[in-house]
Structure formats: C-alpha cells, structure tokens
C-alpha cells in the first residue's frame, strides 16, 4: 500500500486558530472505479474524516457512481500557516546546505490530531495519553518511516515565532537540521 519513505520529520503546530477551526465541506460525485480511499487521497483528506462526514453511507466499502459524498476540507489559513512553517524551516536548512523538507498531507493530518489531543486533554508533551509516542502515533496512522522527529509548539501566533522558538531549542533545532529527514 504505502511506500516506505526514505525518512520523515513530523512537525506539530499548536495555535488557537488551528485547534478551533471548522472544516469546510464540498461535494464530490463518485465516478466508476472510485473508492473512499482514492477520494481521500485525491483531496488529501483522511479516510476517517470522509466516513464521518457521510453518515448516510452505511458501508464505506460500497460506494456507487453518481453517489454524492461530502468532503471535509481544511481551512486555508491553517494550511497556509503550516506551509509557512515548512518554508521558514527550509530557509534554516538551506543556510546549512541541507535539502528542503517536503510538505506531506498525511503527516500534517497526524499533527492536527496530536494538536487536538493536546488541547482536549490539556497537556503539552511529546507523549500523548491517547496515542503514545509520536513514533507509535505515526505507525498507527499507517505511515511507514525510517527516521522521524517531532517538534511541538504552543502559544506562538505566527509561523516565524514557531520557527524561532524551535531554533532556540537545541533538540528542536537538531530535528530541523537532521539531514535524514525529507518530509
């Protein structure tokens, strides 16, 4: 199914608007040969989110051509914030001669779940009472990797503040500059 990535980095962004934003939805008309999984990949949305947005579908494994599905989409301000964090991180990496990190919608999805979990359970830690370690969480979301790291932030209002906070932390800076990470 999923191919083994050369290496991954997992960056978690915590901010008030990321936690409280509501997902917008669009409608998708199923065409022959589609599955909910294929639709999830097409829109870069988790399968579980599509299933949740479509309670009228009694069996998610059976969808039919011309059936209309609701597709939840992320708020553009959230994805823009995340992309800016990646861009600023890549500036730091480039200054050290490292390859840029790629945006990865599946890792971003995991990060949003972790962010929501920290908000719901009122903690700030790399170990989640719900998901365990970041590495277990990545595996449990079906993502294969060879190496991974986690940077978390809380209270920063801008992407620059997030990246500067990480840069001023030895452990987070090491993750930012890890040459083994690609996503």
Question: What annotation goes with each model-predicted range?
Answer:
Residues 1-24:
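Sec-dependent N-terminal signal peptides of Gram-positive bacterial secreted proteins and lipoproteins
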Residues 28, 126, 172:
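Histidine-centered active-site/metal-ligand motif
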Residues 78-119:
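A short alpha-helix/helix-coil micro-patch that ends at or immediately precedes a cysteine
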Residues 110-157:
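Short, surface-exposed glycine/acidic/tryptophan-bearing loops
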């Amino acid at each position: 199914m999923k191919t083994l990535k050369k290496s991954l980095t997992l960056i978690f962004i915590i901010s008030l608007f990321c936690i409280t934003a509501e997902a917008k939805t669009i409608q998708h008309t199923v065409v022959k040969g589609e599955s909910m999984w294929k639709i999830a990949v097409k829109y870069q949305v988790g399968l579980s989110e599509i299933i949740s947005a479509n309670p009228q579908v009694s069996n998610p494994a059976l969808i039919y051509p011309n059936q209309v599905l609701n597709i939840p989409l992320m708020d553009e301000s959230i994805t823009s914030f995340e992309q800016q964090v990646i861009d600023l991180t890549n500036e730091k990496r480039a200054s050290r001669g490292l390859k840029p990190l790629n945006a990865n919608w599946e890792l971003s999805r995991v990060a949003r779940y972790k962010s929501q979990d920290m908000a719901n359970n009122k903690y700030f830690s790399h170990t989640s009472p719900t998901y365990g370690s970041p590495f277990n969480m990545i595996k449990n979301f079906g993502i294969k990797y060879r190496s991974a790291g986690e940077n978390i932030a809380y209270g920063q209002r801008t992407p620059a503040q997030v990246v500067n906070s990480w840069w001023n932390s030895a452990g987070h800076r090491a993750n930012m500059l890890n040459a083994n990470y690609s996503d």
